[in-house]
């Protein structure tokens, strides 16, 4: 559905050239939710604007549904853009228009007849969960409701692709989850290809099938979300995964426990796919003459399975502990022995 080949974007400034996007290659399949994550200044926003040629690439080609956008005439590019919806961090609504009028706007621009527009607008109001708010103005809506209007407007012309530029960054956690649930529902109902950029690993974890990690204008790591969680290669990716696996408070709590329980072997177990922590601990107790304490654990649900982290303290003879660790590794569970002489 989406193909980027050797995409680069350089901006000229009074202080010299700035390479915002550097030789990016991506293939995004139809119906996928593809997440691009990175810190501020990584080049994410520039990259997503290159997908519909709001920014023109300095080098490389962008293909959407087989069409090379850079080679299209202005009129054909406008037609191609109608198949690419976009939502933004700060909603970009028309404040003097009602919900219905905001959603109707792209249909008016496209020359859709009034009766057809009215029918489509009502369908979209129901789809995004805004029943009863059609005559409200943006100033009368919550942040989440404003973003729902933005989503409905982006879907007005039945696009094949939806681009999301930090669409949940201005929302509180509960509202963020409701918008992510809506995007997931739309993806499943319409088989819509969604490309989103974010700096929040929670967004990737909750709805994405594939992820690309961006740093200094480059894609430094990419793949199925579950694989990137299982074996993050780059240091920045490891930092993002750690954010989800363990909050700052949880990390402090863990180190406090380690200070209290300084004896024994402390191990971190990473489960990916279908975690079965309780079953594993029961098996270890049954098979090996060692004492086991669970220090901390959590599970995050991914689109292709689950990701879990479990911290154990093992007490017993060295050879028995080594045998237990070998048994765990034999289950294809990642094991890390944690040094805790702090």
Curated annotation (Swiss-Prot):
Keywords: Amino-acid transport, ATP-binding, Cell membrane, Membrane, Nucleotide-binding, Translocase, Transport. Its EC number is 7.4.2.11. Its main location: membrane. The keyword ATP-binding applies. PROSITE patterns: ABC_TRANSPORTER_1 (PS00211), ABC_TRANSPORTER_2 (PS50893), METN (PS51264). It catalyses: L-methionine(out) + ATP + H2O = L-methionine(in) + ADP + phosphate + H(+); D-methionine(out) + ATP + H2O = D-methionine(in) + ADP + phosphate + H(+). One of its GO terms (cellular component) is plasma membrane. One of its GO terms (molecular function) is ABC-type D-methionine transporter activity. It comes from the Bacteria. The complex is composed of two ATP-binding proteins (MetN), two transmembrane proteins (MetI) and a solute-binding protein (MetQ). Part of the ABC transporter complex MetNIQ involved in methionine import. Responsible for energy coupling to the transport system. Belongs to the ABC transporter superfamily. Methionine importer (TC 3.A.1.24) family. This is Methionine import ATP-binding protein MetN 3. It comes from Shouchella clausii (strain KSM-K16).
């Amino acid at each position: 559905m989406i193909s980027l080949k050797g995409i680069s974007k350089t901006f000229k400034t009074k202080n010299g050239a700035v390479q915002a996007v550097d030789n990016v290659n991506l293939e995004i399949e139809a119906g996928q939710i593809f997440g691009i994550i990175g810190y501020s200044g990584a080049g994410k926003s520039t990259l997503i604007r290159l997908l519909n040629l709001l920014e023109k690439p300095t080098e490389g080609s962008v293909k959407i549904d087989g069409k090379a956008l850079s080679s299209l005439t202005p009129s054909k590019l406008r037609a191609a853009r109608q198949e690419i919806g976009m939502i933004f961090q700060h909603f970009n609504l028309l404040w003097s228009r009602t919900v219905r009028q905001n959603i109707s706007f792209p249909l008016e621009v496209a020359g859709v007849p009034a009766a057809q527009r009215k029918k489509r607008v009502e369908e979209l109001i129901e789809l995004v969960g805004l029943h009863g708010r059609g005559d409200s103005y943006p100033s009368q809506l919550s942040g989440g409701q404003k973003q729902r209007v933005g989503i409905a407007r982006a879907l007005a012309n039945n696009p094949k692709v939806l681009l999301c530029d930090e669409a949940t960054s201005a929302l509180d956690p509960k509202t963020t989850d409701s918008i992510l649930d809506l995007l997931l529902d739309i993806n499943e109902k319409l088989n819509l290809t969604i490309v989103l950029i974010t700096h929040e690993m929670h967004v990737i974890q909750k709805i994405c099938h594939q992820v690309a990690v961006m740093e200094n204008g480059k894609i430094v790591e990419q793949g199925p979300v579950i694989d990137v969680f299982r074996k993050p290669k780059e240091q920045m990716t490891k930092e993002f995964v750690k954010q989800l696996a363990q909050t700052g408070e949880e990390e402090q709590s863990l180190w406090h426990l380690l200070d209290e329980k300084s004896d024994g072997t402390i191990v971190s177990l990473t489960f990916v796919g279908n975690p079965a922590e309780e079953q594993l601990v029961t098996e270890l107790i049954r098979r090996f003459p060692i004492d086991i304490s669970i220090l901390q654990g959590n599970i995050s649900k991914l689109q292709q399975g689950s990701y879990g982290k479990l911290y154990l303290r093992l007490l017993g003879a060295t050879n028995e502990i080594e045998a237990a660790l070998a048994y765990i590794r034999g289950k294809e569970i990642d094991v890390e022995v944690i040094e805790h002489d702090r």
